[in-house]
Amino acid sequence: MGYRLSALTYVQGDLFEESPRPAVLAHACNCLGSWGSGVAAGFKQKFPGAFVEYKRHCDKYSDDNSALLGTCQLIETHDAQTGELVYVACLFTSVRFGARVDGPEQIVKQTKLAMQDLQKQLAKMSGPIDGNSTVHMPKINAGLFRVPWRDTEKVLEEVGQPCTVYVID
């Protein structure tokens, strides 16, 4: 059972195992086409087709990967094990990753823009996924991007898209 704080609901559990289907599963992404570690590696394993689309999308911007910042790539895919329908929302919040990750203030700014872009895309959809759909995510930016969760939480609340945040502690 979760608790509600503005647009956010928190639940204890694994995003991949406990989110409903169909669902929108979001995570913060770099703009270079790498899902090599952290939760991104889990997305790559569960949704290999989505990774191929994400990588192809990033490669189109190889001359200026920063053009992806503040956008969301919404990919329709299927769970590699169950075949269930999932939409993977790639929130482009940092150009780079690792030691060269963008600064926290920049990442938070891009998170707000990317979530607003996701909202616009969902508003155009109908069926089981639409503008009223809840977005399911881990504590984005708080891991390898090293952004304090309270900063990301604040912009998610400002955007107002219903989100369920999965916490594993």
Curated annotation (Swiss-Prot):
Instruction: List the InterPro entries hit by this protein, alphabetically.
Output: ADP-ribose_metab_enzymes (IPR050892), Macro_dom (IPR002589), Macro_dom-like (IPR043472)
Record-linked SMART domains: A1pp
Extract one GO BP annotation from the record: purine nucleoside metabolic process
| Molecular-function annotations in GO | ADP-ribosyl-[dinitrogen reductase] hydrolase activity; phosphoprotein phosphatase activity
Checking PROSITE patterns in the record gives: MACRO
* CDD domains tied to this protein: Macro_Poa1p-like
What reaction gets catalysed by this protein?
ADP-alpha-D-ribose 1''-phosphate + H2O = ADP-D-ribose + phosphate
Q: What is its EC number?
A: 3.1.3.84
Pfam short name (any one): Macro
Binding-site list for substrate? 13-15, 28-30, 35-40, 140-146
Gene Ontology CC entries for this record: nucleoplasm
Keywords associated with the record? Hydrolase, Protein phosphatase
Q: Could you tell me which residue ranges the Macro domain spans?
A: 1-169
Keyword Hydrolase assigned to the entry: answer is: yes
State the function annotated in the UniProt record.
Highly specific phosphatase involved in the metabolism of ADP-ribose 1''-phosphate (Appr1p) which is produced as a consequence of tRNA splicing.
Tell me which family the UniProt entry assigns to this protein. Belongs to the POA1 family.
Question: What is this protein's name?
Answer: ADP-ribose 1''-phosphate phosphatase
Q: Which gene encodes it?
A: POA1
